């Protein structure tokens, strides 16, 4: 894949996200969202899981502008993504759809293109 430090970190994050089976239905994304929250918190974000369904929370992450006492101070950027996936039939795959395996220069798994890769980026 890439030798760039940020790219390597994104690859590892994506590989880990793929290993969470978040097939919808039933849409059990909580564990993946908690993992993402921990990753973002370690980078200085304030994170909160919100949602009507306990196993399908939304992750809201805020990063305060440097020196700002209020999270609402300064410009706002909203990034929207999802970590649920559709059903995969492992027998139809060359690589396990929940392995996050890197092979032949590609990272394989359910969500590698839609949309766990964009979330990891």
PLM feature segments, named:
Residues 2-115, 119:
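Acidic/His- and Gly-rich active-site-bordering loop/insert found
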């Amino acid at each position: 894949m890439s030798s760039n430090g940020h790219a390597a970190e994104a690859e590892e994050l994506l590989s880990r996200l793929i290993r969470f089976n978040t097939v919808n239905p039933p849409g059990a994304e909580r564990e993946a969202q908690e993992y993402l929250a921990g990753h973002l918190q370690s980078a200085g974000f304030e994170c909160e899981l919100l949602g009507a369904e306990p196993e399908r929370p939304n992750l809201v992450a805020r990063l305060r502008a440097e020196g700002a006492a209020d999270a609402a101070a300064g410009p706002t950027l909203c990034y929207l993504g999802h970590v649920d996936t559709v059903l995969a039939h492992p027998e139809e795959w060359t690589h396990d759809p929940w392995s996050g395996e890197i092979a032949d220069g590609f990272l394989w798994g359910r969500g590698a293109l839609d949309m766990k890769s964009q979330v990891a980026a």
